[in-house]
From Swiss-Prot:
Record-listed Phosphoserine modification sites: S579
Pfam families, alphabetized: CSTF2_hinge (PF14327), CSTF_C (PF14304), RRM_1 (PF00076)
Molecular function terms, GO-annotated: RNA binding
Compositional bias segments (type: Low complexity): 234-244, 365-375, 544-557, 575-584
UniProt Sequence repeat ranges: 428-432, 433-437, 438-442, 443-446, 447-451, 452-456, 457-461, 462-466, 508-512, 513-517, 518-522, 523-527, 528-532, 533-537, 538-542, 543-547, 548-551, 552-556, 557-560, 561-565
Keyword Nucleotidyltransferase: no
SMART domains according to UniProt: RRM
Protein task: May play a significant role in AAUAAA-independent mRNA polyadenylation in germ cells. Directly involved in the binding to pre-mRNAs.
GO BP annotation list: mRNA 3'-end processing
Coiled-coil zones: none
Region named Disordered: 201-296, 365-433, 519-590
Domain RRM: 16-94
Protein name as it appears in the record: Cleavage stimulation factor subunit 2 tau variant
């Protein structure tokens, strides 16, 4: 007894008492006391009565002086027959007898645990999972809604509730997984994190954070499992409860590796809860429409680029989605429908849009990646161009230079490339690099075959320029005009329709557009033909050299102004060829002539550094100029 005296009074009493069940309703405490005193001295015997009716419930408790006597009573009196009933004698500390013993004094009411039957902590996770899974969807939703309101309205109270009832927190977490509110993997991470932290707080915290929006405070869903605590030992029970969700999972993992939390989560997952992984953002638009560094969407190749100039080409959408190669942003406005150098399937440049993207029309993209060292050295002379080449030294990626000039695009050509409008980005734009530059037909074989056919540079070639200079004045029309520079047709290019050029025969070789567009000097000097805006920039001299050389429409105006050596050649060689507007040399023509001269001044080494097509285009250009000069 002395050893027992130090124990908790309630615990000591439970150990010295026995539970007596199946007692006849007519039996009295005195009769029962006499029977149980057979094994030892009985301190007290109490029958339990219904509080409302006052009738006996059919069971009671017998308290002995020591635990040994109580154990003897359980061994000897269990099954003892009394008034036709076999008495059931058991340990008073088991099951709900604990609650009864606590209030053993005066008419203590029987207290049923609100958590349900006690459960081994090791089985708590599975029990909670089953409880949550058994809830109808409507009830689960209602519980989660209530819990959300509870958290929003009484944050601290909700937190304390979950901390004190970890089984509830775990149930809410499980419910979120079942309802697909939370990814099972995230739930598992939360549980493991809890484990690593202090079991109580982490476990609670985790559910709190996760379940915040979750299930109702009611212990219903998961409460039953882990929460048998209210019994005699509230302190220990609480600890167990708190640890239950986390403890079983981490602590029992060795014993029940799968059963623990992971299994629960797995079960919920099996239930069909798809792990809510982040939804990958849809790829914006078709490949061609990738965002350029500026953030603007690059027009898709297939789309008519004409409208979207918003995208500053100057930005040089090097990030063409398709080809890794940096291409200038496709000019939104005047991309030739197709005839870019890059278009040609056999275009050796490989950087051409077509070769890179394949299905994408070259015009969709400004130009193939610059090839060869930028030979822009000649640009500067071009006049206003020094800065316009995208503001960067021409040395920069030729494409960038040419294409970039998003600004007024004062293309070095001196023409406000911006104005080019038609030429738009193409001429100087990043597009210059665009295959359009050496539109297949321009610099391509056609260019070779008859691209710069004598006629191309011929009086007619210059002639086309006649209308060209004026119309192309702004370069907008001249270079490819707002409309696509249809190099292929060789017909009059948009605004700059040069009937003669169109007639010039080789559609590819004609000087359509501003220069030898068809011939390879389309737009701004072989723009379409091969010196796209930047003078072969895209296809021909994509490098800065040709860019500057052909860019400003150097080939275009150059052929006219320079090729024919200003107005003198023009009038002398084929006065009739020039259109009426051509009779007088405009500043633009002079600038073009200067650009052409720059291209012609490229050294053999510089020309050798260019891609084959570009090299050939320049050679053809020189040859045509020589012929034109000789003819004049």
């Amino acid at each position: 007894m002395s050893s027992l005296a130090v124990r908790d009074p309630a615990m000591d009493r439970s150990l010295r008492s026995v539970f007596v069940g199946n007692i006849p309703y007519e039996a009295t405490e005195e009769q029962l006391k006499d029977i149980f005193s057979e094994v030892g001295s009985v301190v007290s015997f109490r029958l339990v009565y219904d509080r409302e009716t006052g009738k006996p419930k059919g069971y009671g408790f017998c308290e002995y002086q020591d635990q040994e006597t109580a154990l003897s009573a359980m061994r000897n009196l269990n099954g003892r027959e009394f008034s036709g009933r076999a008495l059931r004698v058991d340990n008073a500390a088991s099951e709900k007898n604990k609650e009864e013993l606590k209030s053993l004094g005066p008419a203590a009411p029987i207290i049923d645990s609100p958590y349900g039957d006690p459960i081994d902590p090791e089985d708590a996770p599975e029990s909670i999972t089953r409880a949550v899974a058994s809830l109808p969807p409507e009830q689960m939703f209602e519980l989660m809604k209530q819990m959300k309101l509870c958290v929003q309205n009484s944050h601290q109270e909700a937190r304390n509730m979950l901390l004190q009832n970890p089984q509830l927190a775990y149930a809410l977490l499980q419910a979120q997984v079942v309802m697909r509110i939370m990814d099972p993997e995230i739930a598992l991470k939360i549980l493991h994190r809890k484990i690593h932290v202090t079991p109580l707080i982490p476990g609670k915290s985790q559910p709190v954070s996760g379940p915040g929006p979750g299930g109702p405070g009611p212990s219903g869903p998961g409460g039953p499992g882990p929460g048998p605590a209210p019994g005699l030992c509230p302190g220990p029970n609480v600890m167990l409860n708190q640890q239950n969700p986390p403890a079983p999972q981490p602590q029992h993992l060795p014993r029940r590796p799968v059963k623990d939390i992971p299994p629960l989560m797995q079960t919920s997952i099996q239930g069909g809860i798809p792990a809510p992984g982040p939804i990958p953002a849809a790829v914006p638009g078709p490949g061609p429409g990738s965002l350029t560094p500026g953030g603007a969407m690059q027009p898709q190749v297939g789309m008519p680029v004409v409208g979207p100039v918003p995208l500053e080409r100057g930005q040089m959408q090097i990030s063409d989605p398709r080809p890794p190669m940096p291409r200038g942003p496709m000019p939104s406005g005047g991309i030739p429908p197709r005839g870019l150098l890059g278009d040609a399937p056999n275009d050796p440049r490989g950087g051409t849009l077509l070769s890179v993207t394949g299905e994408v029309e070259p015009r969709g993209y400004m130009g193939p990646p610059h090839q060869g060292p930028p030979m822009h050295h000649g640009h500067d002379n071009r006049g206003p161009a020094s800065h316009d080449m995208r503001g960067g030294p021409l040395a920069a990626d030729p494409r960038m230079l040419i294409g970039e000039p998003r600004g007024p695009m004062i293309d070095q050509r001196g023409l406000p490339m911006d104005g080019r409008g038609g030429r738009e980005s193409r001429g100087m734009e990043t597009r210059p690099m665009e295959t359009e530059v050496l539109e297949p037909r321009g610099m391509e074989r056609r260019m070779e075959t008859c691209a710069m056919e004598t006629r191309g540079m011929d009086a007619r070639g210059l002639e086309m320029r006649g209308p060209g200079p004026s119309s192309r004045g702004p370069m907008t029309g001249g270079i490819q005009g707002p409309g696509p520079i249809n190099m292929g047709a060789g017909g009059p290019q948009g605004p700059r329709q040069v009937p003669n050029i169109a007639g010039v025969g080789n559609p590819g070789g004609t000087m359509q557009g501003a220069g030898i567009q068809g011939g390879g000097m389309q737009g701004a000097g072989m723009q379409g033909g091969g010196m796209q805006g930047a003078g072969m920039q895209g296809g021909g001299m994509q490098g800065a050299g040709m860019q500057a050389g052909m860019q400003g429409a150097s080939m275009q105006g150059g052929m006219q102004g320079a090729g024919m050596q200003g107005a003198s050649k023009q009038g002398g060689g084929q006065p009739s060829s020039f259109s009426p507007g051509q009779s007088q040399v405009t500043p633009q023509d002079q600038e073009k002539a200067a650009l052409i001269m720059q291209v012609l001044q490229l050294t053999a080494d510089q020309i050798a550094m260019l891609p084959p097509e570009q090299r050939q285009s320049i050679l053809i250009l020189k040859e045509q100029i020589q012929k034109s000069t000789g003819a004049s």
